[in-house]
């Protein structure tokens, strides 16, 4: 990098899947004080171009092809001048650079729910401290074998995998992209002891037909998931020490996290204390607001978006719903913007999703609000079923009706094979904005 003229403070983009090359470039950029700009491998040419221009990237390191995507052709299309195919990289001479804790380490582009994503600016201090605090909470040991499901181009991969494993000296295991069958095979073969991920990733693992024949060595990790999924993770994957976690890119990412020594029921319910030095408050609208050392410096070259992200007194607006108990433990209850109103009654999708997930046949559940002439909005649910189980739309709606007030019962429900084509991101999250758009078309609304 230094031979290419890259120096302290220069943004450098990385476009490639998980692997040793990504890690080498990330660590190298950090050593010379450069700022890594991870590029989502699912981005199209115009999205890559936007990120490069918005961040002011001085160079782009890429692999020529991945998943039948011709990145070389994309880069030629956008005409970026300093693009380096990693297969052509040669070893250079390293000149030490003095890097400060407050220097930028990463510009993380978020999953865009509007026209384009925003570049979250994170420092060495915020990411390393977050990785250390999270690793301490889940009890990482030097002898652990930690399987990372998350893409390195997200903070769940960079902070909570690449940096966490470096700090604690454990073995990091990963795959170029997540696929349940390959992940289960890797977990068994590498005797992994820790794993992390969101609800969708764990549901895909637990719902796969290969799970019963795999001999897993898992003891813990962390999961961003609701109570039904947390209980299943403990019972079906044997992760007795699994911890609940909540965070967002703008917070480096984790805000609260269980301790592996917390009582099991607290961890299942997702009741977790903030990381040391992080403060949380709940607004009148029940929004989670945060401040402390892990919060972003702002959005890259976007002062208007940065100003809107904070309250007048300096708290980060998360856009998430939550509540604090008397012990100061947070329970996240869904996205504020995902709440919909049925005849004047507020419905949080997470409430209905938890009921659907309690059905023995349901693997994954996602609920969105869709227009209704009489009630304003009604619920629309998409579910996947566990391997070997059967259920009809009518049975699942009846299941919810028996357990929820009528206004919470979905008026539409569709059983699907997966969410890959209707809203799932590369990090395994389901974007409800895209899922809602799909529902409007599918049901002619």
Regions found by a protein language model. Give the residues of each.
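AMP-binding/adenylate-forming catalytic core of the ANL superfamily
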Residues: 43-50, 60-62, 195, 282-287, ...
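Gly/Ser/Thr-rich phosphate-binding loop
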Residues: 184, 189-197, 206-265, 279
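Conserved AMP-binding/adenylate-forming
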Residues: 1-46, 346
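Conserved AMP-binding/adenylation subdomain of ANL enzymes
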Residues: 128-145, 152-194, 204, 208
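Conserved pre-ATP/AMP-binding loop-to-beta segment of ANL
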Residues: 84, 92-109, 116, 121, ...
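Structural core segment of the AMP-binding/adenylate-forming
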Residues: 3-4, 31-88, 387-389, 402
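Short hydrophobic alpha-helices that are characteristic scaffold elements of the AMP-binding
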Residues: 27-32, 53-54, 154, 163-167
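AMP-binding/adenylate-forming catalytic domain of the ANL superfamily
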Residues: 405-427
């Amino acid at each position: 990098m230094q031979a290419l003229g890259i120096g302290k403070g220069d943004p450098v983009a990385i476009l490639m899947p998980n692997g040793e090359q990504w890690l080498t470039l990330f660590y190298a950029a950090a050593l010379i004080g450069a700022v890594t700009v991870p590029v989502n491998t699912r981005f199209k040419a115009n999205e890559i171009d936007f990120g490069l221009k918005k961040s002011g990237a001085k160079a782009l390191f890429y692999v020529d092809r991945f998943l039948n995507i011709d990145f070389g052709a994309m880069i030629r299309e956008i005409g970026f001048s300093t693009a380096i195919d990693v297969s052509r990289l040669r070893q250079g001479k390293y000149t030490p650079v003095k890097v400060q804790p407050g220097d930028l380490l990463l510009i993380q582009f978020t999953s865009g729910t509007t026209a384009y994503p925003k570049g979250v600016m994170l420092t060495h201090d915020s990411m390393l401290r977050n990785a250390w605090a999270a690793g301490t909470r889940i009890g990482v040991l030097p002898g652990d074998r930690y399987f990372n499901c998350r893409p390195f181009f997200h903070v769940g991969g960079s902070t909570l995998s690449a940096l966490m494993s470096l700090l604690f000296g454990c073995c990091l295991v990963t795959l170029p992209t997540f696929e349940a069958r390959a992940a289960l095979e890797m977990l068994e073969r590498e005797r992994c002891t820790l794993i992390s991920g969101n609800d969708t990733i764990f549901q895909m693992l637990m719902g796969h037909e290969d799970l019963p024949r795999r001999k897993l060595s898992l003891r813990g990790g962390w999961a961003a998931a609701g109570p039904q999924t947390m209980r299943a993770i403990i019972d079906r994957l044997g992760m007795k020490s699994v911890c609940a976690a909540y965070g967002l890119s703008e917070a480096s990412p984790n805000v609260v996290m269980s301790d592996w020594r917390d009582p099991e029921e607290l961890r299942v319910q997702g009741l977790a204390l903030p990381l040391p030095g992080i403060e949380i408050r709940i607004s009148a609208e029940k929004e989670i607001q945060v401040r402390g050392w892990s919060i972003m410096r702002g959005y890259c070259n976007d002062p208007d978006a940065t100003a809107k992200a904070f309250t007048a007194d300096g708290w980060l607006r998360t856009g998430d719903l939550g509540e604090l108990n008397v012990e100061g433990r947070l329970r996240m209850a869904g996205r504020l913007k995902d709440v919909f109103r049925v005849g004047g009654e507020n419905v949080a999708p997470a409430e209905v999703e938890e009921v659907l997930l309690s059905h023995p046949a349901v693997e994954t559940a996602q609920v969105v609000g869709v227009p209704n002439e009489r009630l304003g909005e009604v619920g629309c649910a998409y579910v996947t079923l566990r391997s070997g189980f059967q259920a009809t739309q009518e049975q699942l709606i009846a299941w919810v009706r028996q357990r929820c007030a009528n206004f919470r019962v979905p008026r539409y429900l569709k059983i699907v094979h997966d969410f890959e084509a209707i809203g799932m991101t590369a990090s395994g999250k389901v974007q409800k904005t895209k899922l809602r758009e799909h529902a409007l078309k599918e049901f002619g609304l």
